A protein has these predicted regions:
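GIY-YIG nuclease catalytic motif and its immediate N-terminal context
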Residues: 1-41, 49-59, 66-76, 90-104
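Conserved C-terminal helical docking segment of ANL/AMP-forming enzymes
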Residues: 45
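A short, polar/charged loop-to-alpha-helix boundary motif
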Residues: 81-88
Length: 104
């Protein structure tokens, strides 16, 4: 499948220390496994090292890579309280899209 036709996901990982990490991927299960991998191969995010256990707090499809990047950026601009508020409302896709378009 070509890069442009893949289905992209936005995901939030809850770390063992309670922090939240936001990312995008085409395969959430694979990406979580990469983040959890502690054998030093370097495929997980450096910011997650030492923050085990890692669990998926949220994930949803967002369509294109471009849309995923915009939504990821919008979520990363929120503080922890904002991310928690989004999670408590179950982060509906319309909310995410409006967040990503608010900077345009």
């Amino acid at each position: 499948m070509s890069e442009s036709r893949r289905c992209w996901y936005i995901y939030l990982i809850r770390c063992g220390d309670g922090s939240l990490y936001t990312g995008i991927t085409t395969d959430v299960s694979r990406r979580l496994a990469e983040h959890r991998d502690t054998d030093g191969k370097g495929k997980g995010a450096k910011s997650l090292r030492g923050k085990q256990p890692l669990t998926i707090a949220f994930s949803t499809t967002v369509g294109s890579r471009s849309a995923a990047l915009k939504i990821e950026y919008a979520i990363k601009q929120l503080g922890k309280a904002g991310k928690e508020a989004l999670l408590s409302q179950q982060l509906d896709l319309d909310t995410l899209k409006s967040l990503s378009q608010s900077d345009e």
